[in-house]
Curated annotation (Swiss-Prot):
Cysteine pairings via disulfide bonds: C43-C57, C50-C61, C56-C68
Coiled-coil boundaries: none
Lineage, top ranks: Eukaryota, Metazoa, Spiralia, Lophotrochozoa, Mollusca
Region (Disordered), start-end ranges: 20-41
Tissue specificity: Expressed by the venom duct.
Family: Belongs to the conotoxin O1 superfamily.
Protein name per its UniProtKB record: Conotoxin AbVIF
InterPro entries hit by this protein: Conotoxin
Keywords: Cleavage on pair of basic residues, Disulfide bond, Knottin, Secreted, Signal, Toxin
One MF term in the entry's GO annotations: toxin activity
Cellular-component GO terms for this entry: extracellular region
Source species, domain of life: Eukaryota
Organism: Conus abbreviatus
Notes on the domains: The presence of a 'disulfide through disulfide knot' structurally defines this protein as a knottin. The cysteine framework is VI/VII (C-C-CC-C-C).
UniProt signal peptide: 1-17
Amino acid sequence: VLIIAVLFLTACQLTTAETSSRGKQKHRALRSTDKNSRMSKRCTPPGGYCYHPDPCCSQVCNFPRKHCL
């Protein structure tokens, strides 16, 4: 009976450890995505002023009027 109780408690601990490690992995992935979004370059939406550091999101700039298409 004691052996069965020890095996049951060990199985419960392993299951709990797997569940909590999955939660941490998901959290790390979210943190990584947030970091990547901050590091990505900005782009100017259509109708906005186009200039070199922040190119147009559409990749098309009307240079005479200097706005993104």
